[in-house]
Amino acid sequence: MNALGIQLQLRGTEHVPRSGGAVLACSHVSYLDFIFAGWAAQPSGRLVRFMAKQEVFNHRLSGPAMRSLHHIPVDRGRGLESYATALDYLRAGEIVGIFPEATISRSFELKTFKSGAVRMAAAVGVPLIPVVVWGTQRMYTKDHPRDFSRGQTLALTVGEPMTIQTGNPLGETARVKATMARLRDETIRAYPEMPQGAWWLPVSYGGSAPTLEEAARLDVQERRDRLGVLTARAQRRADRRWRLWPPFRKAT
C-alpha cells in the first residue's frame, strides 16, 4: 500500500461486527478485490475468509498465500463441499467473504447476483455486510494491462448489517443487490476522478466500459475459449498416453 502510494478511501467500516460470524458480500471489478475488501474488517480487528475459485489456489503465486490465510477454495464440481466449509467458518464465529456476482464485471456495473451469500447468512443466522470496492479495476482487471503506478485512489464502502430472512432467497438476493447498487453509486460519486470516456468507468457514468449486454457476450466467449483450451489439453494428454501404451509401441 505505502510502496504504491495508494490513497485509500474507507467509509462505514464501523459496520463490521467486532465478534461473531458474518457474511461479507463484495462487489467484483478486479482480480485484487479480495485483498482490499479484507481491509473493511481491519478496523474491527477481524480477518475475512474469502471464497475463491479453485484456479486461484492452484496458481503458483497466489495459491500458497490463499492456503496460508485459510481462504475457502470453490471447486465447481464440488460446490456443496465449499458451501459446507463456509457454514462451518460462520458457525465458528468467522467472517466469510463472497462475491455474489461470482466473476469480475467487465462493465463495472453490478451483474446478476447468485443467491449463495443470502443462503449462507440465513442458514446460520448471521448478518450480511454489503461491501463495494471501487478503483481496483484501474490496477488489474480483465482485458486491460496491469497498472501499479503510484498515487491511485481505491475506495471501499461498507453498508449497515442486513438481517436476512429465511424462505425467500431470490427476494433477499434482490434486496442485497439493490442495497449494493446504492452503495456503489454513492462510492462512485465520492470518487475524486470521473474522466469522461475513461475505460474504467461504466457507460452510466460517462465511461467507455462495455455495457452489461456487451460484457455478457464477452463472458460467454471467454468460457468457450477456456473450454476449447481444456479440451485441447485433454486431447494432447490422451494422445500422449496412447503413444506410450505398450501394445502400440510394439506395433511400431
Annotate the PLM regions.
Residues 1-5, 73-77, 106-107:
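Short, flexible loop segments at the rims of nucleotide/cofactor-binding pockets, characterized by
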Residues 17-78:
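Catalytic core of membrane glycerolipid acyltransferases/transacylases, capturing the structured
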Residues 10, 59, 80-83:
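Structural motif corresponding to alpha-helix initiation and N-cap regions
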Residues 10-11, 72-75, 164:
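Short acidic-hydrophobic, aromatic-tinged amphipathic segments that line or gate anion-handling sites
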Residues 1-20:
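A short, well-structured juxtamembrane/interface segment
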Residues 80-252:
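Non-catalytic C-terminal accessory region of glycerolipid acyltransferases
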Residues 1-7, 58-69, 147-151, 250-251:
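Alpha-helical membrane-targeting segments
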